[in-house]
């Protein structure tokens, strides 16, 4: 089942911001979406607001 996690890209490597349940060397597919762009696109009403905070709240409420 697909799982969405946040990651940061540093020095050519994607680093997850939370623990992932993977074995060392396991291959995965990554779909890149900038968090801010997703929130602004779907929730245009939030333009100019703290989109990262809004997305985290939506995830907590089970909408994402």
From Swiss-Prot:
This is Putative antitoxin AF_1074. Gene3D superfamilies: AF2212/PG0164-like (4.10.1150.10). The lineage of its organism: Archaea, Methanobacteriati, Methanobacteriota, Archaeoglobi, Archaeoglobales. Keywords: Toxin-antitoxin system. It comes from Archaeoglobus fulgidus (strain ATCC 49558 / DSM 4304 / JCM 9628 / NBRC 100126 / VC-16). InterPro entries: AF2212-like (IPR008203), AF2212-like_dom_sf (IPR024069). Possibly the antitoxin component of a type II toxin-antitoxin (TA) system. It holds the Pfam family AF2212-like. Belongs to the UPF0165 family.
């Amino acid at each position: 089942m697909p799982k969405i996690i946040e990651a940061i890209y540093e020095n050519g490597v994607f680093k997850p911001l939370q623990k992932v349940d993977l074995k060392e060397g396991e291959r995965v597919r990554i779909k890149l979406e900038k968090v801010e762009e997703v929130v602004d696109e779907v929730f245009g009403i939030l333009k100019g607001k703290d989109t990262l905070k809004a997305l985290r709240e939506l995830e907590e409420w089970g909408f994402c």
